[in-house]
């Protein structure tokens, strides 16, 4: 599927979910053992329920069927991101301040790319990660390669 098709799907899904007060955490489209899978990871205050996943699946599935955005056969899966959910926005870091996270930077900082610690405050558009009570990393979201909560 083209990048434009993925962006079109992501834009539609995000607008539908926003009207439902649901966050689109991540979207994946990949070929797996049983064929192509479009996987949506959603989150909501209070947690994701099976009924919510089914509702999102119906709404998104109807749109994809009508618009015929995906050329090949695929399966649509909707689920929660799990306890080790990705952190992709400043709002995510604000929401989960005080929780344990692992971040990986695009470029090394003091010779290290990967850090694990407690999410600190978001200030001036920068996220911070505390290790042993001190700020170990303070950077813009664009400097992060990956970030996720950890147990």
UniProtKB/Swiss-Prot annotation:
Keywords associated with the record: Cytoplasm, Ribosome biogenesis
* Main subcellular location of this protein, as a coarse class: cytoplasm
A single Pfam family it belongs to is DUF150_C
Its Gene Ontology cellular component terms are: cytosol
By its UniProt entry, which Gene3D superfamilies does this protein fall under?
A: Ribosome maturation factor RimP, C-terminal domain, RimP-like superfamily, N-terminal
The record's annotation in InterPro entries points to: Ribosome_maturation_RimP, RimP_C, RimP_C_sf, RimP_N, RimP_N_sf
Where in or outside the cell?
Answer: Cytoplasm
Keyword Cytoplasm carried by entry: yes
> Is Cytoplasm one of the keywords UniProt gives this record?
yes
PANTHER family per record? RIBOSOME MATURATION FACTOR RIMP (PTHR33867:SF1)
Protein function: Required for maturation of 30S ribosomal subunits.
State what protein this is by name: Ribosome maturation factor RimP
